[in-house]
Regions:
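Active-site-proximal helix-loop elements at catalytic-domain edges
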Residues: 346
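Histidine-centered catalytic micro-motifs used for acid/base chemistry in nuclease
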Residues: 350
Length: 350
């Protein structure tokens, strides 16, 4: 029987958890390892508490207490040994992928990232000892999870897809991918996710990939984080991608981001306006326009169209003034501290 051993938590699980002696192999601790350590500590704490209760029983002798504790440990061990392992033997590798997806519909939902990795693995067969899908998908995950900013791989996948193809919710993206990605185009789609991962991270982690000469663009992105706005992400991803691919100039990127920043400052940060619908779809549509643009003039027109749509949605001056008067920061009212800091920095710059 072939057993696939986990590598994501290797060698932490083997050295720190399963081994009774001190660890001999150095390892790095990430979020997965922290979760494993937390689970281990919970079990250990509960076992220690139960043993302490047996050993502190004052109604019988210490010898009887020790015997009861040993019997309880034996019972616990036997319970673990009595766990059943279900072995499923399949005729082909494709059947394994099918079962993987079928089980997902019966129990707890798997992460979108896991489903996509499985889909790519089914379509792209390893031509050598190097597992192309495994290496590339690990790069996607590492790029996102190594960010000091808390980022979600599933959200990245949704934004990447919306920026290129169509506006689909997280629940529908996997079905869209399955309908679009086949054996002929799987490699190119996988490569797109790999390249998009870095650009997407730089939208939220503004210390990543941005140079000092690009500080105005990174400031606008940092401002959107201050406003806690994620709706523009698909459109911004296409903008950053086009800039990195030298399809648009830095000036075009900077001006587009500045207009997006100004709109959401008044619409979200100051007035907390509610969208009547369509803003997320608008940014997704804009992202696709940039993605499909054959030259810089078409991209420039797409940016101009977006700026026009943002102006059409501008908050009336009366509403802005009323909202701005409510922006305060004191020792007792500190929830808007970052917004007040943003406003003061803007005043200082200008």
């Amino acid at each position: 029987v072939y057993v696939l051993k986990t590598e994501s938590s290797f060698p932490f699980l083997q050295e720190e958890i399963l081994k009774s002696e001190d660890a001999e192999v150095p390892f790095e601790i990430g979020r997965e390892e922290e979760a494993i350590q937390k689970a281990y500590n919970i079990f250990k704490e509960k076992i220690d508490q139960s043993l302490a209760e047996y050993l502190s029983n004052k109604e019988q002798t210490a010898e009887d207490n020790t015997k009861d504790a040993a019997d309880w440990l034996s019972m616990l061990r036997d319970t673990v040994f009595d766990l059943n392992l279900i072995l499923v033997t399949l005729d082909s590798e494709d059947d394994a992928y099918l079962i993987f997806e079928t089980l997902n519909t019966r129990g707890k939902d798997l992460a979108l990232a896991d489903l996509l990795r499985n889909h790519f693995a089914k379509l792209i067969k390893a031509a050598s000892e190097v597992d192309q899908v495994k290496q590339k998908w690990s790069k996607v995950q590492d790029t996102i999870k190594s960010s000091p900013v808390q980022l979600d791989p599933d959200t990245f996948i949704v934004h990447s897809w919306q920026s290129r193809y169509d506006f689909a919710t997280k629940a529908k993206v996997f079905h869209k991918v399955k309908d679009t990605v086949n054996k002929k185009n799987a490699k190119s789609h996988l490569d797109r996710f790999v390249s998009d991962a870095e650009q997407w991270r730089s939208i939220f982690d503004t210390d990543y990939l941005w140079s000092k000469a690009e500080k105005e663009a990174s400031r606008s992105l940092a401002a959107l984080r201050t406003f806690k706005v994620v709706q523009p992400a698909p459109g911004i991803l296409s903008l950053v991608r086009a800039y990195r691919d030298k399809q648009i100039k830095y000036r075009a990127l900077r001006n587009a981001l500045s207009n997006i920043e100004k709109f959401h400052f008044s619409f979200n940060a100051v007035t907390s306006s509610r969208s009547s619908g369509g803003i997320s779809g608008m940014y997704s549509s804009f992202g696709r326009s940039i993605f499909e643009a054959d030259d810089s003039s078409i991209a420039a027109q797409a940016i101009a169209d977006l700026v026009g749509k943002l102006r059409d949605r501008e908050v009336p001056a009366v509403e802005f003034d009323a909202g701005f008067q409510q922006v305060i920061y004191t020792n007792k009212h500190s929830s808007q501290k970052t917004l007040v800091q943003y406003i003061l920095k803007k005043v200082a710059i200008h």
